[in-house]
């Protein structure tokens, strides 16, 4: 099965967590299961939320999916588990983590990044305040994450 990264169809592909269209490739995540089905996320934080969803378990019933994340600087697709993450980026859903191929001072590995997101070490509160001041969130009701 071909599990190489897919091209984003900006007119069609949407995040399965928040239902927003994929608008910024440099923060996108895609998961491809052994059947070749692809699901999209517009922010690594949305991906982390989905890990606890029953639909993720269904998606990977035939085996572990290959998961790609775009390098925040270049847009190159990286293996999500091998990438390094910096905190402080302005990301589509405000989690604040951008991926990089290279580890630099202050960057986190995948497991640490997931743990930080689950602990709420994100820019979500700042993001929500900004969106509220701009007239509200644009994602589906109840789908804007934690």
Set out the residue ranges of the language-model regions.
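Intrinsically disordered, low-complexity linkers and terminal regions
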Residues: 1-40, 44-146
């Amino acid at each position: 099965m071909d599990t190489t990264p897919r091209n984003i169809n900006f007119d069609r592909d949407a995040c399965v967590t928040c239902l927003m269209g994929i608008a910024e490739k440099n923060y996108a995540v895609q998961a491809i299961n052994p059947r070749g089905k692809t699901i999209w996320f517009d922010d690594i934080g949305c991906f982390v939320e989905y890990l606890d969803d029953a639909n993720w378990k269904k998606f990977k019933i035939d085996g572990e999916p290959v998961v790609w994340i775009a390098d925040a600087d270049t847009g190159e697709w990286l293996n999500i588990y091998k990438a390094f993450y910096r905190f402080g980026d302005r990301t589509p859903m405000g989690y604040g983590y951008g991926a990089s191929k290279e580890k630099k001072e202050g960057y986190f590995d995948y497991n640490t990044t997931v743990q930080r997101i689950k602990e709420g070490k994100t820019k979500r509160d700042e993001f929500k305040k900004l969106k509220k001041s701009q007239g509200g969130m644009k994602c589906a009701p109840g789908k804007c994450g934690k």
